Regions:
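Secretory targeting signals
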Residues: 1-26, 32-34, 58-125, 164-174
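Hydrophobic alpha-helical transmembrane segments
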Residues: 99-103, 129-130, 179-180
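Terminal transmembrane helical anchor/hairpin motif
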Residues: 1-15, 131-184
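Transmembrane alpha-helices and adjacent helix-loop boundaries
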Residues: 37-42, 72, 122, 126, ...
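Interfacial "coupling" helices/loops that link adjacent transmembrane helices in transporter permeases
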Residues: 42-60
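Transmembrane helix boundary and interhelical loop/hinge segments in multi-pass membrane proteins
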Residues: 13, 30-48
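Membrane-helix interface segments
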Residues: 52-54, 124-129
């Protein structure tokens, strides 16, 4: 379990943090304004047709989860393609490592998207985006601090280090570092 929560020392991997931030910004901006169309648009008419509010919220959460899954699978395909170009073995990890990476990556991005959705429901879309980005930045900085101090328990509450754990071996090569910022 300690190998799962160790995370990545972000001070040595600036390209990893930049590529992960670009990917999270894709997810956040894809979900931008997702709740406003239900609050101020045709959501009023669905409520008038005797649809439940929980059903509408379920639609919003399902759309959020599906978009996170699509973006995560797209990222995995891009990484596999870059490794194929370099003629490296794609399956250097065990199946448990790969499934652990996929599961934690989807969960961390889903948490950020749910955080954005809840803030959008209460305040505005801009407040949701600012909250999601600030949570990601604070979580990444605190994750690096806790790794330096070798305090692994607080990392359980910081989701971004979960998603970056198993990717360091995949994108640490020089060839991939040049293109990772533009592709992901």
């Amino acid at each position: 379990l300690l190998g799962l929560i160790e995370g990545v020392n972000i001070r040595n991997s600036n390209m990893l943090v930049a590529s992960d931030f670009l990917f999270i910004s894709l997810v956040v901006f894809n979900l931008f304004g997702n709740c406003e169309k239900y609050l101020y648009g045709y959501g009023k008419y669905e409520l008038l047709r005797y649809k439940k509010r929980t059903l509408i919220l379920g639609k919003i959460i399902l759309k959020s989860f599906l978009s996170v899954c699509v973006f995560c699978l797209t990222r995995i395909i891009i990484y596999a393609f870059l490794l194929f170009i370099r003629n490296e073995k794609i399956i250097d990890f065990t199946v448990a490592d790969i499934s652990n990476y996929i599961f934690t990556s989807i969960l961390s991005l889903f948490f950020i998207s749910i955080l954005q959705t809840l803030v959008e429901l209460k305040f505005s879309s801009f407040a949701g985006v600012i909250t999601a980005f600030s949570y990601y930045i604070v979580s990444t900085i605190l994750g690096g601090y806790f790794i330096e101090k070798e305090q692994y328990f607080p990392l359980l509450f910081l989701t971004t280090n979960f998603s970056m754990k198993n990717r360091t071996d995949l994108i640490s090569a020089d060839f991939v570092d040049l293109y990772i910022l533009y592709l992901i």
